[in-house]
A protein has these predicted regions:
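Conserved beta-alpha junction segments in alpha/beta enzyme cores
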Residues: 1-3, 134
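Conserved strand-to-helix beginnings and helix N-cap segments that scaffold or border functional pockets
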Residues: 6-7
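C-terminal catalytic domains of large/alpha subunits in multi-subunit enzymes
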Residues: 11-247
Length: 247
């Protein structure tokens, strides 16, 4: 599910490497670069890719720190990267100079990160196990007006409080919550499933059922994020915000 993934992984890379986001470019998924990626599904995009990007960036940062420590004769743990500058007890170097120096000294400047969700197991027969790493919570109150004679309805106001853990990007997450609500409203009010006498689904595309549009958004629409650190080890203690708002 779309969650502003490119922006979020760019934020993760920027934060881990200590460089401005303007220096980060995320490329589209391409099997020529990463042949075995997981599907963009189950609201797992930010969790999986964010942790993988963080792992890859930590690998790169360790290589660069090791190189700088040897070059400047200082302890590895005293080297920091912040705002595009590498600093140590006796030096400061812009990021571009660090990269050039590493390249000239034949330090590998590429890395792969991998992450899989831990602690997941489920026995279908026994109905036991842990199918999910964590749960996302939310509460909403919606005011609607309904014509009791025709059934015509309109959403007047909606107030939502949604649990995103420690949000990676509040603007993106609020937009996702808003979109999930409108999508869910359409699912419950206009997207009817109709089969013919032979069991063939007739309402199989937007051409055969009505989906909500921008005008179906409530005029008063208040969304707040419940800033509650995820107790699980997710990327910066955030939570998925793909399908949870829809439900």
């Amino acid at each position: 599910m779309g969650q502003g993934l490119f922006q979020k992984v760019a934020q993760v890379a920027s934060r881990t490497l200590g460089v401005p986001q303007s220096t980060i470019r995320a490329s589209a998924t391409d099997t020529s670069k990463v042949p075995n990626t997981s599907a963009t599904a189950a609201s797992s995009g930010s969790d999986l890719n964010g942790m993988a990007v963080d792992a890859a960036c930590q690998t790169l940062q360790h290589r660069l720190s090791t190189h700088l420590a040897a070059q400047h004769q200082c302890q590895l743990n005293l080297i920091t990267f912040k705002d595009g500058v590498a600093s140590g007890p006796n030096f400061e170097m812009p990021w571009i100079d660090v990269i050039n120096s590493a390249y000239e000294n034949r330090i590998s400047l590429s890395a792969t990160g991998f992450y899989k969700t831990p602690h997941i197991k489920w026995d279908r027969i026994k109905g036991q196990g842990r199918p999910f790493l964590y749960f996302a919570y939310g509460a909403s109150v919606t005011e609607v007006v309904i014509d009791v004679l025709t059934g015509e309805n309109r959403i007047l106001r909606c107030d939502i409080l949604h649990d995103c853990g420690h949000s990676l990007n509040p603007a993106l997450d609020i937009g996702q919550v808003e979109g999930g609500f409108v999508q869910g409203a359409g699912w419950l009010t206009t997207e009817e499933l109709v089969w013919d006498s032979e069991g063939q689904l007739k309402t199989h595309a937007p051409s055969t059922y009505k989906i909500p549009c921008a005008s179906d958004r409530p005029k008063i629409f208040n969304v707040s994020l419940f800033d509650n650190l995820n107790v699980e080890n997710t990327i910066y203690k955030s939570k998925a915000v793909g399908e949870p708002p829809f439900m």
